């Protein structure tokens, strides 16, 4: 499969223009590292995060790199686990007004209240999988040969996700508490990027996690690892964080 996708990408990249130079900010924080613990029992994917498994996962809180954005600074916490079948990611999002309009697979969920993970196995340069998931539980998945064009038609079979909302969706007249999301990403999703995608203890992958919150013009992007870009943009793999797989 890697050979097939390599041939496809060669043809794909040959017909798209080069990317513009991306302006970066200075004095950036060090790239973070996260130890992904092995789950003894796989969490239920129901969006509620009440499984005992999540208690063994270290929480990380997203930062707000762009002070000029006018949206509320609402807290996002993420946790990761793994086993021989899947990578598990959980997000908890404080949100006073949960909004999600898009309902179909591969809709532009990033325009809603949404969370994301971008991820690639070791040895892969500027090529990663993207999963962007809104508060409804709608998935936009793709392969991104950065900095070219996102391959929107590339799908990840077997991904399971669910959300839970504390409040009412798309009702700005009341006060919500927030929403949470769980996703299980099969290691088989990475079979085009790695011959043996199931990690071993000590393996290091690259990833970033993000949240889009609010509606235009009051919208804000928060991140685990600051992309360092001048304008709010999560896509910059040189600034992805490191995932280390541990017991």
Give residue ranges: language-model regions.
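Bacterial N-terminal signal peptides
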Residues: 6-16
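Structural preference for beta-rich elements and adjacent junctions enriched in aromatics
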Residues: 22-247
């Amino acid at each position: 499969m890697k050979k097939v996708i390599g041939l496809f990408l060669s043809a794909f990249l040959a017909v798209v223009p080069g990317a513009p130079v991306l302006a970066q900010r200075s004095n950036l924080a060090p790239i973070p590292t996260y130890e992904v613990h092995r789950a003894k029992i796989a969490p239920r994917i129901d969006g509620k995060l009440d499984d005992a498994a999540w208690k063994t996962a270290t929480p990380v809180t997203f930062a707000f790199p762009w002070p000029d954005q006018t949206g509320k600074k609402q807290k996002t916490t993420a946790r990761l686990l793994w086993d021989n079948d899947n990578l598990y990611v959980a997000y908890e999002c404080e949100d006073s007004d949960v909004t999600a309009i898009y309902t179909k697979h591969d809709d532009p969920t990033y325009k809603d209240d949404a969370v994301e993970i971008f991820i690639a196995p070791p040895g892969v340069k500027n090529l990663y999988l993207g999963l962007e998931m809104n508060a409804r539980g709608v998935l936009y998945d793709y392969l991104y040969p950065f900095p070219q064009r996102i391959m929107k038609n590339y799908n990840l079979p077997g991904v399971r996700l669910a959300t839970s909302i504390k409040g009412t969706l798309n009702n700005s007249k009341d006060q919500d508490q927030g929403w949470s999301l769980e996703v299980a990403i099969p290691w088989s999703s990475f079979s085009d990027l790695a011959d043996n995608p199931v990690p071993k203890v000590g393996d290091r992958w690259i990833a970033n996690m993000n949240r889009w919150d609010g509606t235009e013009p009051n919208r804000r992007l928060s991140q685990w690892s600051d992309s360092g870009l001048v304008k709010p943009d999560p896509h910059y793999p040189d600034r992805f964080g490191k995932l280390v797989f541990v017991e």
